[in-house]
Each structure stands twice: as structure tokens, then as C-alpha cells.
Design a protein with these regions (language model features):
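Fe(II)/2-oxoglutarate oxygenase catalytic core
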Residues: 1-151, 158-195
Length: 195
């Protein structure tokens, strides 16, 4: 696992993320971008992914393996306390990241190369920890605080993980998985291409 605080150094990008009122409009909708070797980054989320994984990655793999890397699956998520009537959940259950459409159709588990969680906006929250069970389901999880401008890279397809309940405030994050080959939902349209 890699954790980098104050990850994005580009103040104009951070300001754009803080001020974009539409960034979290599609919470839980899985999107796909084939990377800059297929098409230029044309949305704020794609520009963020390019900054995270191509221009400023603490892990060298994506920069030097575009032949192997098919692209990026990404989605946003927001969680708030269960007593707040805003239609949001207060937690995310324990799971592995995987090709969800394929798993639902066949039961086969195919996982991404690596996973990422990034916190793009300031938050004042209690709870909402990313808990990663790298020692197995029964082991004590690693608990990572949701913190503004923090990048977390981990084996999301190998280790069970979840978001602990949020008891105060609004937890906001974007998750990005790197894939090769692309998950099946790209071909079937269950994972959308963001415009």
C-alpha cells in the first residue's frame, strides 16, 4: 500500500476540484477512460486521473506500461450519517474490486491491476475510514483516514476493503482502478464513457 498526503501540487487543479459542483453528480456510476494514449483527457475526472497516474504517479507502472495497461475504471462516492435524509449511505460494505458485470453473469472473479482512492475536496467528518483487510477477513484492518488531497494505492482486487460508517459530515472520494484487459462492462455498455 502507498499513501501520499498533499498529493496534487497543482493549485489550479485543486481549486477546480473544490469548486466543481457537478463532480459528485454521478456517484456510484462506473466510468471508463482508455488513457491518454487512446484519447486526450477531456473531463475534470480524466484530467485528475492523468495527474494521478501519468504525470505524478508514485508508482512507475502506468507511465511505462501503456502497452499492457488498457485504461482506467473510475467512480465517485459520497457517504453521510444514516440519520441524514440525503439518499446517501453511511458506509460501504466489505468487498473486493472486480469486474462486476462479469461476476454477476458468470460468477467468475477478474480483478484490476491496482486500485486507488483519492479525496479531492476538503471534509470535516467523523468516521468514513477506508479499512483494508490485508491480513484476511478476520484480521485487524488497516484504517486510513479520509483526508483532503490524500492518495491511497492498494491491491483493491486482492484485499477485502470497506468504508466504515460516517457519523458526522460528508465523505467524498473518487476511486480509480487500472485494468488490463478492460472489464467486460466497457464492451457491454454497463461501464460508461464519460463525456
Amino acid at each position: 500500500m502507498i499513501i501520499v498526503d498533499d498529493f496534487i501540487k497543482d493549485e489550479s487543479l485543486l481549486e477546480e476540484l473544490r469548486n466543481d459542483s457537478t463532480f459528485f453528480d454521478d456517484n456510484g456510476v462506473y466510468m471508463w477512460w482508455g488513457g491518454p494514449w487512446n484519447s486526450p483527457a477531456s473531463t475534470l475526472k480524466q484530467r485528475l486521473i492523468e495527474e494521478m497516474w501519468i504525470k505524478n504517479s508514485p508508482w512507475d507502472f502506468p507511465r511505462y506500461n501503456s502497452i499492457i495497461l488498457s485504461g482506467f475504471e473510475y467512480w465517485t462516492g459520497q457517504y453521510s450519517p444514516s440519520d441524514v435524509e440525503d439518499g446517501k449511505k453511511d458506509n460501504l460494505i466489505m468487498h473486493y474490486d472486480k469486474d462486476e458485470p462479469l461476476w454477476h453473469k458468470t460468477g467468475e472473479i477478474v480483478t484490476p491491476i491496482i486500485g486507488t482512492v483519492f479525496y479531492p475536496v476538503p471534509m470535516d467528518i467523523d468516521g468514513g475510514y477506508l479499512e483494508i483487510f490485508s491480513r484476511g477477513r478476520e484480521g485487524e484492518p488497516e484504517r486510513i483516514e479520509a483526508k483532503y488531497n490524500r492518495l491511497v494505492i492498494f491491491e483493491a482486487g486482492k484485499h477485502l476493503h470497506r468504508v466504515s460508517p460516517v457519523s458526522r459530515g460528508l465523505r467524498s472520494a473518487i476511486a480509480v482502478n487500472l485494468w488490463s484487459p478492460p472489464p467486460s462492462g466497457v464492451e457491454t455498455g454497463e461501464i460508461i464513457f464519460e463525456n
